[in-house]
Amino acid sequence: MKKVSPILRILGIVLCFLIPFNIISQDNSNIEKEIFNKINNYRVKIGKSKFIFNDSLVKSCRSHSNSMGINYKLEHVKNLSEVGANAEIIQLNYTTGRTFIETSDDVLDIFLDSPSHKKIIEGIYNQISIGVFVTKDEDLWVTIRFK
C-alpha cells in the first residue's frame, strides 16, 4: 500500500470541508432567485408590475438572515432607513428534505397568509432585495426588503 503524504491528507480534509459550503452558498442564491420569481409571478397574476431586483441591499439582507439564524431569533431591523429600505418582511421556514422550489412556494404562501406581509408584497414598492440563510439543521431564514 502506498503512503499518502501528510500534505495531501490535509489538502483532502480541507477540500471535504470547502465543497459543502460552496454548494450551500449556491443553493442559497437559487432559493433567493426562486423566491423573487414566485413573488413577481404572483404580482403579475394580481395585475401589479414586477419588482426590480435591488442588488445593493442583498448583502444586508443576507447578513440579517444569517444573524437571525445564528441567534435563532426572528427580529426586524429597528431603523430601516439605516439599511436603505422602506419595508421589511422576515420568516423562518423549516426545509428538511425539500427542494428550493418547494421551499420558495412555502415562503410565498406563508407571507401571503399574513395580511400585513401580503399588503407589503402587493403594495406601492417597486424594488426588492432578498437574502436567505440556511442553518446546518436546514432551517431557512429569509429577509426581504422593499424600496
Q: How would you describe each model-predicted region?
A:
Residues 23-147:
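Functional surface patches built around histidine and acidic residues
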